[in-house]
Amino acid sequence: GIFYVPILDATKFNTTSGMESLFLHEAIPGHHYQVSLQQENSQLPKFRRFGGNSAYAEGWALYTESLGKELGLYTDPYQYMGALGDEMHRAIRLVVDAGMHSKNMTREEAIKFMMDNEPLSEEGTIAEIERYMAIPAQALSYKIGALKIKEIRERLTKQLGAKFKLSDFHDE
């Protein structure tokens, strides 16, 4: 398939960092690849082939971003710096999502926290915060899912020792 990145204003969008982590997350080995394999797997029941699970889907996509460094896929330091910026964004999401839904953080406090801690536009920040308001814990699902995949990988690495193959783990 083809992966398109719709850039509304190329004069304002930073393509010098973060594009490779975006590709890993959204395309290969991220969502595009994951969903293609999932939908082609006739051994899965239909609710798993065509349904969604945010912790699995977003967890996998976030996990694949970490593979960029591990497998030497980032082509320059700016792309890796962009990946680290994306990781910071995920950490900030954890604070505001959990804060709004369990700690009485207001919409305005969440917007301020996000704008104080990362370089997003006000419009982008408001859109993010309203997304978290509408879909509680969706932002949390990225990190929780990725951590669970890493936990399973570490457990299997210890259990299997020299027999552990990363490609086999990713195939399961």
Model-predicted segments: where are they?
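Long, His/Glu/Asp-enriched segments that create or flank divalent metal/ion-associated functional microenvironments
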Residues: G1-E172
